[in-house]
Amino acid sequence: MRQISMQEAAARLKSGGLLLYPTETFFGIGCRVSDDDAIARVFQVKRRLFAMPLPVILADAGQLPLVAQVAPALAEDVARLERAFWPGPLSLILPARMHISPLLTGGTGTIAVRVSPHPVPCELATLVGEPIVASSANISGHPAVTRAEALDAELVQAVGAVLDTGPEPTGGEPSTLVEPLGNGRLHVRRSGAVHNDRLRAAGFEPESGIA
């Protein structure tokens, strides 16, 4: 398993490569969000269905306009969510910018974004100057892992490089996925590390099961 430095990892992403790297929960596999060929390779090496969207990690909230559009009616709620939960394991589902690959959105026209509390993906996104893809580093259907040594050998060989630095992922629940609906209402698309009681405590009204 070839482990590389942060600078090497950023250069690899800039040149169109894939990377295995730690996040706050599990190891992830990623590339630049603007690299359609690399995004397609993420699906291939994970054996992931193309209809399944890929989440994205931002360096900070300032990168949000690079990938997502926030309607004026949602702007206040999105800003409140950013202040209350970023950095943290809360992904916002928002309309994607027109230039964003449909592979990232799964054809839905929306994209899931978060600012990770783990320093590695945020520094990578800073160094490459754009958000990065952040899918779990596993073959689809296999368990996600928290240690580099536990990464699937086939995946490591296909990707070719591992950045193993910073805090070890803690495992546990994945990020919570929410879609802002306006007026403080949130459609909870996936329950996770940020529970409904925390959303309510921040002044939001979480809802599930919306068609």
Question: Language-model features: where?
Answer:
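Active-site-adjacent structural elements in enzyme catalytic cores
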Residues: 1-211
